[in-house]
UniProtKB/Swiss-Prot annotation:
Family: Belongs to the tRNA pseudouridine synthase TruA family.
Active site: D54 (nucleophile)
Name under which the protein is recorded: tRNA pseudouridine synthase A
A GO molecular-function descriptor: RNA binding
EC numbers on record: 5.4.99.12
Gene label: truA
Subunit structure of this chain's protein: Homodimer.
Assigned keywords, A-Z: Isomerase, tRNA processing
Function according to Swiss-Prot or TrEMBL: Formation of pseudouridine at positions 38, 39 and 40 in the anticodon stem and loop of transfer RNAs.
Originating organism: Geobacillus thermodenitrificans (strain NG80-2)
Domain of life: Bacteria
Amino acid sequence: MTRRIKCVVAYDGTYFSGYQVQPGKRTVQGEFEGVLKRMHKGDDVRITASGRTDAGVHAYGQVIHFDTPLALSPEQWKKALNAQLPDDIAVRSVDEADSTFHARFSAKAKEYRYNVWTAAERDVFRRHYCAWHPYPLRVDAMSEALGLLKGTHDFTSFCSAKTVIEDRVRTIYQAEMEVDGPMLQFRFVGSGFLYNMVRIIVGTVLEVGQGKRPPDDIEALLAAKDRRLAGPTAPAEGLYLWRVYYDGESFGH
């Protein structure tokens, strides 16, 4: 009997060349599938994720699924996987899922967070986990800009020029930020996100905060559908795939 296993996985992306398997490079998928291969006596077991993350990008709530003939309980799976995975990957929870569940296609929404350290001095102990932006910021203007992103829009201006997906319409349900001393955290919940979309939004909103562009420039950028007009792509290290939402799960904090 084959079982479908769903895992919620956290990882520190610092020393990975991204999530997806790449020949000769250390990846999250490669490490995970290596452990599963050992557990299945040399048989290949493919995992499917809710989406890929780039080199340096972290995850607190990545979701993966795989099919297995092994008759282990969810708790046994969690213990076995965490005993063999490297220190920068942790399985947070395991459930046996219905055979129709799909980590990517069953997802209803995703939540990303982005951390920015705004102190005048660089913090060497945070350098892998937040972007450093030591400039005065107008938080009220940034909040106004974020509000204009909510709703259903074509986000062509806010995705990489390398994006091959033709349909770039997405719905942003929540776009907000919290300030805790010198730490600034952005939070985005949406139906889906294009390549580099969150990082380009953050780079653009930081320009609003510096007074380089007005908050309502967001509306003009959405209408223009031109990546060249938006701000820079914020660094990978500040980005976290925080949570993936499925049927029946609300988009609360």
